[in-house]
């Protein structure tokens, strides 16, 4: 586990309350992975984190996926999802508006106009 999340070794025995948001997310992911799950459920794993931490978590999740763990996540960060996920679903008001590969979703004109326009 420490190989995937070396930051956990650095924080050692620190109490969870003393950890940064990114360290807490990594700790939560690490704890979940210790059970050798077949399925990992994540709710907003990139929320409120610095871009470097988000990139690190994306890399960890890619490695976890390569190891055969299925990952189901909900997140608003499309760049993060594109790095981690094979497929995606766009939800609006609790209903699926679009589903497909991440490339298909990112190329969809309605998604770009509605959710990615600045």
Question: Language-model features: where?
Answer:
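Conserved ABC ATPase signature
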Residues: 15-19, 23
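ABC ATPase C-loop
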Residues: 32-33
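Catalytic Walker B motif of ABC-type/P-loop ATPase nucleotide-binding domains
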Residues: 40-44
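A short, surface-exposed alpha-helical micro-motif characterized by mixed small hydrophobic
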Residues: 81-83
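Helical segment within the ABC ATPase nucleotide-binding domain
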Residues: 55-67
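Conserved catalytic motifs of ABC-family nucleotide-binding domains
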Residues: 36
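H-loop/switch region of ABC-family ATPase nucleotide-binding domains
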Residues: 75-76
